[in-house]
Amino acid sequence: MAIIKPNRDLKPDGVTVVTREVWAENLESEFELISEIIDDYPFISMDTEFPGVIFKSDLRFTNPDDLYTLLKANVDALSLIQVGLTLSDVNGNLPDLGDDLHRGFIWEFNFRDFDVARDAHAPDSIELLRRQGIDFERNCRDGVESERFAELMMSSGLVCNEEVSWVTFHSAYDFGYLMKILTRRELPGALGEFKRVMRVLFGERVYDVKHMMKFCERRLFGGLDRVARTLEVNRAVGKCHQAGSDSLLTWHAFQRMRDLYFVQDGPEKHAGVLYGLEVF
């Protein structure tokens, strides 16, 4: 099992981060690349974009079972828009894919499942994503089919692999959408079964930065951008609410948090818990 080592330099001098945009036409070739490097870059940071939430709770504080019921209702009814993946090695380096231009690469998958003219969504969420550059019309025309994405992801080494670790931020919905796509069915009816499928697909080394914030000496709060600012971590590429960019910012925030607050005992004891659901 690989141990995550401290990395003081989150963006080495001279390295340019490039987002690899994935559409239907290059889906298979990009998964071929990922499959070839996953053994050397087993740390996966993930973010998704989806059409907001259409079912909401009247209660400010609810237990994990109630929160899961709400999550399931939304995920079952809605469709994924983007998935961002950042792969890293044990020292925090991004894959260069043999490039000699001092570039590191991350991935952003664009899906065709969601049709803004047809499907349920939260209008404010859609407007926010439009402002951040998501082209819903192009997604419908050129985007990835979730069924083919699932087939390729299942055989890529990203899932059902005990050697990988996942790093996320407030990720119950993110994993919910991935589980829905990978299993090709609605989410399990109960939180306990959701936990079981999570372990099968993603293993036990799942780190949710939002959960880990509770155990930092310095008080951290808010969303990803606010936490990153507090940790003095800059966005290396792209904009907020772009899944590829957010996956990289999540990885950098995790690295900084680990180096500041988890030097003595490491972050491993906080693995396997999704914020709000107390998963695992």
From Swiss-Prot:
Superkingdom of source: Eukaryota
SUPFAM superfamilies named in the record: Ribonuclease H-like
Compartments, record wording: Nucleus; Cytoplasm
Keywords: Cytoplasm, Exonuclease, Hydrolase, Metal-binding, Nuclease, Nucleus, RNA-binding, Transcription, Transcription regulation
Cofactor: a divalent metal cation
Known EC number: 3.1.13.4
GO terms of biological process kind: defense response to bacterium; defense response to insect; nuclear-transcribed mRNA poly(A) tail shortening; response to wounding
Gene Ontology CC terms, in alphabetical order: CCR4-NOT complex; cytoplasm; nucleus
Binding of a divalent metal cation, residues: 47, 49, 174, 246
Protein's recorded name: Probable CCR4-associated factor 1 homolog 9
